[in-house]
Amino acid sequence: MIENVPGIEENICVETVLSNLSQQYPQMYLNYPLVCNDFEYGYLEGMNSYEFKFASYLVSNSALLVFREPKIEGCFHIPDFYIFNTLSNSGRLVELTLYDSNYTGYRNSRRSYQEVKKSIKRKQEQIEEIKGCGIPYVILYRQQLENIRQRCIKNLF
């Protein structure tokens, strides 16, 4: 039994949150939430820099539990996060993408046209899986990430 998780406020019972979420969304499997100490080295394996900065910013809000890469039964692609707000007792899957909502405007000169095309197809499939999994979600496209960068998280990407 987990009484508390280091780095999570004492009045938040992570075990209860996980139990409630597993009943509400039995198709979703979560690991323990990220905590501030997870960000002390400036890097988390498998997480790109803008995901790292975004998660670090959210973890600094003690009312939020940030679960990394939730596994969803029937989904081949994994969303970036499941964010749970302990004040509203609700959460959402969160997927970050540097593509805009029309899948245009992504510039990376190091990648061939075929690589970009394949990446766009994968991202579209991932978003369709997220939309169809029965769990509330939000997709943050480049436009929203630009706004977040301007207002909240400088140097997000």
Stretches found by the model and what they are:
Residues 1-157:
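Nucleic-acid endo/exonuclease domains
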